[in-house]
Amino acid sequence: MKKFAALLAAVVILAGPLAAASKDEKETDRLENCGLIVKEIMDIPDDIPQDLIDKAECIIVYPSVIKGAFIVGASGGRGAMVCRTGEHFTGPWSAPTMMALEGLSVGFQIGGQATDFVLLVMNPRGARSILNSKVKLGADASAAAGPKGRNAEAATDVTLRAEVLTYSRARGLFAGISLAGSTVRPDNGANEKLYGKKLDAKDIIFKGAVAVPAAAQKLVAYLNQKSPKNLSDPESLK
């Protein structure tokens, strides 16, 4: 009996580090996927215009998991958001806050293929709203399908005034897509798993409460190289 108790204690001791290591595994994998998606998409010259990337305050990436012909639960997915640091979004890119995407239309059929979503948050109001609470696209924040091409000159005024520009990639095809009616929100439960403590999304972005985790270093380094400076009108950042 004593031998069994000793063996059980040893198993518990060994299992502890394994459980801790796997606790944030999903979030770590998600961040690595976000980095791959952003680089693959932004390295293609005729996809997201560089001038829009340079004027974005934040970028949200959702690597989606598909079940059958629909997004799982016909509702949404999980991803991450990075922003330019500082009160006025003028600093280097931040550590990520984990995000949720909810309320996708059940009619969003994609033939069983994985679909990635990339959202550009184009002004401070939109960024602060998303960091504060859940935001319904098209209602709480104006949203539009993002334009493609080397620049955004051909985009409509409605598109250029949107607080959030949305893109999708499925079957290797990349396009602007409307996500109006969907909800984006910080996933604070995932943040706690990733960082090992309770954190508010605003603390991560504005206060630099945590360092960039290893799984997100490629994503953040790539964005700092791709778009090191916010080129928005300084007056719009106040």
State where each predicted segment sits.
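Positively charged n-region of N-terminal signal peptides that target proteins for export
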Residues: 1-4
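Bacterial N-terminal signal peptides
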Residues: 7-16
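Small-residue-enriched, tightly packed secondary-structure blocks
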Residues: 21-238
